[in-house]
Amino acid sequence: FLPKSLFTLVTDKSL
């Protein structure tokens, strides 16, 4: 799992 993917996932959840 790449950090960018995780960040994107978290951002999607935040949004």
Swiss-Prot record:
Q: Name one GO molecular function term.
A: cytokinin dehydrogenase activity
Alphabetical keyword list: FAD, Flavoprotein, Membrane, Oxidoreductase
The GO cellular component terms are: membrane
- What parts of the sequence cross the membrane? none
Q: Which cofactor does it need?
A: FAD
Query: What compartments host this protein?
Result: Membrane
Report the EC code(s) recorded for this entry. 1.5.99.12
The chemistry this enzyme catalyses reads: N(6)-dimethylallyladenine + A + H2O = 3-methyl-2-butenal + adenine + AH2
Q: What is its main location?
A: membrane
Task: Describe the pH profile of activity.
Answer: Optimum pH is 6.5.
Q: Name the enzyme's class.
A: oxidoreductase
Q: How does it assemble?
A: Monomer.
What task does this protein carry out? Catalyzes the oxidation of cytokinins, a family of N(6)-substituted adenine derivatives that are plant hormones, where the substituent is an isopentenyl group. Substrate preference is 2-(2-hydroxyethylamino)-9-methyl-N(6)-isopentenyladenine >> isopentenyladenine > cis-zeatin = isopentenyladenosine = zeatin >> zeatin riboside.
Name the record gives this protein: Cytokinin dehydrogenase
